[in-house]
């Protein structure tokens, strides 16, 4: 009976005119600076956030709870920051530390731990739909650990959030993109891969883009874009044509596997290439047509074929020949309608009108301070 209840609720909502005008909801209003409120118990707050909390408590005649005992505080911060309890030695050291900033010292120590990135990177990996297998009935293994490790390193390195997002949406399009920035685009290679027989490749490609648009909306905007795949959204201010404007960015993506060697693999390949160079020099110095040269040439050909392979990563790459994007009637890719140019939902901050706008432009718009 759940759907009947929802239907009646929305009928009631519309009948009373409660839906309001587009853009009036607080979520679509640019954030503003608010000075911390004045509080009565001025000696309790240790930072501006405490003042907001205390002001709310005082407005309801409530008082803050007393500070917990040190051992409980230590356990809480350990579980929050790195997901692991403190060791007996860490407990002893903290209980013996009588400095006023003893707690701050623990926090700094935990933030520099590799476990911090492993703990907090998981939250992003869940949102990025990270998995080590393809999904569907075959659910074959896939190599995605390089993207996972990139997220962990970015978290531990305190990578600025705008850079964190741009590299995942369009790292391959950055000037002189590094291997790590290309690996970051694995964010949108976490889509399911259907390796079953008889698969329509174009349908699967379109389904992957649908997933990328929906994920972008949910993770970065907090909006359910998926409904606008087939029609104007019923309760979020997103039109179907706006959905396909975002679709247009991901429609220009190819999905290669790229060699991203580990340090050990890189050194192994480097040593191999050095051997090829040395053997090539011997071939060139040997007499043309001689048996010695023929033997060296055979050895060289065999050596080149034996070049060590490196780990591959699923990444995104911008197409050299752009695709035309259409709006799909009822979300059906076999029913293309009008041609759509790249763009963004009108309810959000303005985007420069340009037919040449690409995924990097979109990524920078997403991370704009507006």
Residue ranges and their predicted role:
Residues 264-302:
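Mature extracytoplasmic enzyme cores
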Residues 297-329:
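Coiled-coil termination/hinge junctions
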Residues 338-351:
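Reverse-transcriptase-like RNA-dependent polymerase core
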Residues 16-20:
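Sec/Tat signal peptide C-region and signal peptidase I cleavage site
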Residues 216-220, 226, 349-370:
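C-terminal substrate/ligand-recognition segments
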Residues 21-267, 317-336, 340-341, 360:
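Short, structured secondary-structure elements
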Residues 5-15:
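Bacterial N-terminal signal peptides
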